[in-house]
Design a protein with these regions (language model features):
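A charged, amphipathic alpha-helical module
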Residues: 165-293
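N-terminal Rossmann-like or analogous alpha/beta NTP/dinucleotide-binding catalytic cores
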Residues: 42-89, 97, 102-104, 110, ...
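Beta-rich, aromatic/charged-enriched effector core domains that present basic-aromatic interfaces
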Residues: 81-222, 403
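N-terminal beta-strand-loop-alpha-helix module at the start
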Residues: 1-73
């Protein structure tokens, strides 16, 4: 009896578990479906990227002689959801069971489990740590901290290890990083790819079917197959990795990419494997082509943060995205959808997101995320925004970054402190403030940077929770030393700003 082998849009790896299980007579099922394309209103470039990559991947499998039943979005027989397509294909091919690789989202894991056909969900072993390994690591720990997990992953992979010791004698070189960046005309941007006929057909489809989703569809310049993704990797290793470390926390308003790799779309869709990306970085270090602090910082993001976030998502369970530890209920303001704002940092971070479906980590954390947290925005709305607007967004990685790291809505599972800052941090790490209508040096008054007002207001509102936090508790000393009239003025002006935000007035 034929079996169906399910390959989802973010499982485009030749050695994904379900494909390794293929036997003669099996039918590989791939489907562009509205259920996946609309569970949030994804950025049009994200839909186009995945559909083009899916079509090309299917073509490669067919070229190997495998049988692929591929459904395009506009196929009149399309059942428009993964379960309905599996049932339709099972009837068509007389298949009685489905082999899948476990999806990266609880919603789909459950949908497959509920299918009225036997479904085997194989572990997704494209990740370094299995669920069991992460659970084992997490059990009996009072706090789950990425740094300890990361060291285990270094030992496990042998990456940047000299025997049982870390290369250079330290696990983490972040103290050499965190430098601001300067405008640099010679900095190499990631390679751009002109759409080929397959991609152009998909772009036309997306333009017709998703005209109202937030974000520009064209120009579209992402790679959509493994060969292109490998080109992006090679380019990053040759031109940007060496400077990655020092500038990884920097922001420049006219440079959306700096020395970031822009590899997350390819890693998350399966076109590149985390191991090969890290091996390439480690090899460049071993060859003396890049500094250790850059290679280490980059590898940590992948075998540390990326794996840790996935571990948390599966450890915490399906209700994680509903957490709201700080009881925040404000609606996401229209500026997140491109409504004009005088706040230059937000205006640029959102415009860049609209144009590229991309922002780098520190923009996501310290601009859009920081503002949402300071303003007390409902974390579920924030979560949906991030899931919608970024090309690399899948719940397993997006939710722990947003609900956990950025919004502290999980009460401290991911991070030991909330990532909040006044305008001072943004000014130090970027060139946004120079071009802003607000004054970053002003703590109160008409022109005061809203981050300055909201920072203290946030800390004052959440004093009970954070005053005893070992990482930020000390800041309350500064607040307490402030003149009470000044404290009142800050809080009044913060309240007035938030009232304008709620009223939909320009801010
Ligand atoms: P680089 O800076 O070049 O880093 C290299 C790689 O490290 C990335 O490609 C990524 O795979 C990995 N990485 C770095 N930081 C993280 C992290 N915190 N968690 C997981 N992986 C990491 N990343 C996603 O892949 N999808 C998301 O939906 C996503 N949402 C985020 C939301 C918020 C609020 C924050 C603060 C971070 C989010 N991240 C997400 C993490 C990070 O911002 C992106 O991985 C990174 O910006 C992708 O760009 P890059 O490939 O140029 O990364
Ligand atoms: C994100 C996405 C989109 C937009 N469309 C599809 C699709 O049509 N077919 C498909 O198989 N997968 C798609 N995906 C990726 C899935 O949403 C993803 O597999 C789950 O969210 C689990 O990570
Ligand atoms: Fe952003 Fe404040 Fe700087 Fe303006 S002054 S760019 S609002 S941090």
């Amino acid at each position: 009896m034929a079996r169906l082998i399910l390959i989802l849009g973010d499982q485009l790896s030749r050695d994904v578990a379900a494909l390794r299980a293929v036997q003669p007579g099996d039918v590989i099922v791939m489907a562009e479906v509205m259920a996946e394309a609309s569970y949030v209103r994804h950025h049009p470039q994200k839909i186009a990227f995945l559909f083009a990559a899916m079509r090309k991947f299917a073509g490669q499998l067919r070229a190997e002689g495998l049988t692929v039943a591929y459904t395009t979005l506009d196929d009149p027989d399309n059942g428009q959801s993964i379960p309905s397509e599996l049932l339709r294909r099972a009837a068509q091919h007389g298949a009685t069971r489905v082999i899948a690789t476990e999806p990266g989202e609880w919603r789909l894991i459950r949908a497959l489990a509920d299918l009225p056909l036997p479904v085997t969900q194989l572990p997704d072993d494209r990740f370094l740590a299995s669920h069991a390994e992460f659970q084992d690591w997490a059990k009996d720990r009072k706090e789950l901290r990425m740094e300890w997990f990361y060291r285990d992953m270094r030992r496990k992979t042998g990456l940047l290890m000299e025997g049982d010791q870390p290369a250079g004698g330290q696990w983490n070189f972040d103290h050499d990083n965190r430098k601001p960046a300067r405008a640099d005309l010679l900095r190499q941007a990631p390679p751009r790819f002109d759409p080929d006929p397959v991609t152009t057909e998909v772009l036309d489809l997306v333009a017709a079917r998703f005209p109202d989703n937030f974000g520009r569809l064209r120009p579209f310049a992402y790679a959509t197959d493994r060969a292109g993704a490998l080109q992006v990797l090679d380019h990053f290793i040759a031109h940007s990795l060496d400077d990655f470390g020092p500038t990884q926390d920097a922001m420049l308003q006219d440079d959306p990419f700096l020395h970031h790799s822009v590899l997350s779309p390819y890693l998350n869709a399966g076109l590149l494997s985390p191991r090969e990306v890290c091996d390439a970085a480690a090899k460049a270090y071993a060859a003396g082509q890049v500094r250790l602090n850059s290679a280490e910082g980059f590898i940590r993001q992948i075998i540390g943060w990326r794996e840790f976030m996935r571990g948390i998502y599966f450890l915490e369970g399906p209700e994680y995205t509903s957490r709201n530890a700080l009881n925040h209920h404000r609606n996401l303001p229209p500026l997140y959808w491109g409504a004009p704002t005088a706040m230059n940092c937000l205006s640029h971070a959102v415009a860049q997101t609209r144009d590229h479906a991309y922002a780098h980590h520190i923009q996501r954390l310290m601009v859009t995320g920081n503002f949402a947290l300071l303003a007390g925005i409902d974390p579920h709305q924030v979560h949906e925004w991030y899931l919608e607007v970024y090309i690399d967004a899948y719940e397993w990685v997006e939710a722990p970054n947003v609900i956990g790291m950025s919004q502290f809505a999980d009460g401290g599972v991911v991070g030991s402190k909330p990532y909040v800052s006044s305008g001072n941090y943004i000014n130090k790490m970027s060139d946004y403030c120079k071009g802003c209508a607000y004054k970053v040096a002003d703590k109160t008054g008409d022109k005061a940077c809203p981050f300055n007002l909201l920072y203290w207001d946030f800390l004052a509102r959440h004093r009970d929770r954070f005053a005893t936090n070992p990482r930020i508790g000390r800041i309350y000393g500064t607040w307490d030393r402030m003149d009470p009239d000044r404290q009142s003025l800050i809080r009044e002006q913060a309240a007035a700003f938030l009232a304008r935000l709620d009223a939909g007035d320009p801010v």
